[in-house]
């Protein structure tokens, strides 16, 4: 049996000197306003995985009202989601993440992002895709107010 999930997340910018996407620290003139590290790509992916397993969303499992998750590395959350899915008898088949950002340019970081996801999900790198796009100046991403991400995940019964 196969199950498909879709996820989305967005964070606005705040003062800072870097952002984190798929666990990769990227130098930038701003940071994310968030309870955790603000990794929108991993948050969208967690939602896609949880959705595929009919387990709700990231906020249900890791609420921003819980001090344990203040500033947490979102890779920790992703690994926990993978473990919860595995406990239900599912493996991750493949994932596809799209980051929507006017800036910074992400091409130089995509391979490291893919490697992090493959490692954390315990799947081959050729089962992981990460891509970036802009909105050509439209919307909150285009105005430089923040970044969003979309993710799709396929689960297979072991």
Curated annotation (Swiss-Prot):
Binds 1 divalent metal cation per subunit. One of its GO terms (molecular function) is metal ion binding. Its cofactor is a divalent metal cation. It is an enzyme of class 4 (lyase). The record marks 35, 134 as: Transition state stabilizer. The keyword Lyase applies. One of its GO terms (biological process) is isopentenyl diphosphate biosynthetic process, methylerythritol 4-phosphate pathway. Belongs to the IspF family. HAMAP family: IspF. Homotrimer. This is 2-C-methyl-D-erythritol 2,4-cyclodiphosphate synthase. It comes from Methylococcus capsulatus (strain ATCC 33009 / NCIMB 11132 / Bath). The gene is ispF.
